[in-house]
């Protein structure tokens, strides 16, 4: 599924169309997170977005259509947040630590991420797979390059990427989502950096 926004018939959107589509996606994020997929409805989404039902169908074909597009949208934005944060690092361990911090900030701003991705397991399994495949794709490339450069220990970059994603997802769930925090404390982030450094075989704790 493409990350480029289009109308339901595949035509490029105007700036106004992009804004309307964004409003609908933000409304869908809130409605699906609060009510769950089965209790959510197009009526509730359009009411939350402040647009008519006819407008909805210019951008999405169905409730499942907007759900699938929402998964793609959240995936794109969380990857962007992590990449931008990680780009400030100068070593792989530093990049990992900063990338995780970017992920936790995104989770604090968008707690619906967890609820919607978990719903995808039952509503749209193919979108669940797409979400994680897109997360790991660039991650694997970066880890492989770090291994080839001798910056981290050699190993299976795909296995390492999935293991690190598991750490980030569960730490974010426990200490951001469940605890209602905006971010991990500096002390916890430092400790997590040391755990990651040991996991990837780097002598640098990310600080």
Predicted regions and their residues:
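C-terminal peripheral helix-coil segments that are non-catalytic and often amphipathic
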Residues: 1-8, 105-106, 137, 141-148, ...
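An amphipathic alpha-helix adjacent to DNA-recognition modules
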Residues: 18-26, 38-39, 50, 58-83, ...
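Amphipathic alpha-helical packing segments from all-alpha helical-bundle domains
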Residues: 76-79, 124-149, 158-162, 170, ...
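Short helix-capping/turn signature of helix-turn-helix
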Residues: 60, 117-123
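Hydrophobic alpha-helical connector segments
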Residues: 69, 83-112, 160-164, 189
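Basic, helix-initiating cap at the start of DNA-binding domains
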Residues: 1-35, 41-48, 65
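Key DNA-contact positions within bacterial/archaeal DNA-binding proteins
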Residues: 54
């Amino acid at each position: 599924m493409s990350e480029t926004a289009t109308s339901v018939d595949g035509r490029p959107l105007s700036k106004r169309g992009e804004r309307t589509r964004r409003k609908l996606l933000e409304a869908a994020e809130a409605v699906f997170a609060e009510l769950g997929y089965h209790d959510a409805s197009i009526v509730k989404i359009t009411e939350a977005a402040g647009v008519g039902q006819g407008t909805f169908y210019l951008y999405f074909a169905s409730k499942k259509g907007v759900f699938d597009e929402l998964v793609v949208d959240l995936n794109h934005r969380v990857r962007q947040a992590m990449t931008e944060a990680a780009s400030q690092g100068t070593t792989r361990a530093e990049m990992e630590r900063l990338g995780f911090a970017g992920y936790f900030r995104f989770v604090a701003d968008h707690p619906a991420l967890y609820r919607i991705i978990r719903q995808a397991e039952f509503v749209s399994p193919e979108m669940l797979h797409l979400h994680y495949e897109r997360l790991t794709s660039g991650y694997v490339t970066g880890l492989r390059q770090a291994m080839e450069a001798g910056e981290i220990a050699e190993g299976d970059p795909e296995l390492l990427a999935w293991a690190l994603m598991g750490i980030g997802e569960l730490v974010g769930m426990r200490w951001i989502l469940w605890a209602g925090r905006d971010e991990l404390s500096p002390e916890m982030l430092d400790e997590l950096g040391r755990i990651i450094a040991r996991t990837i075989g780097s002598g640098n704790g990310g600080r």
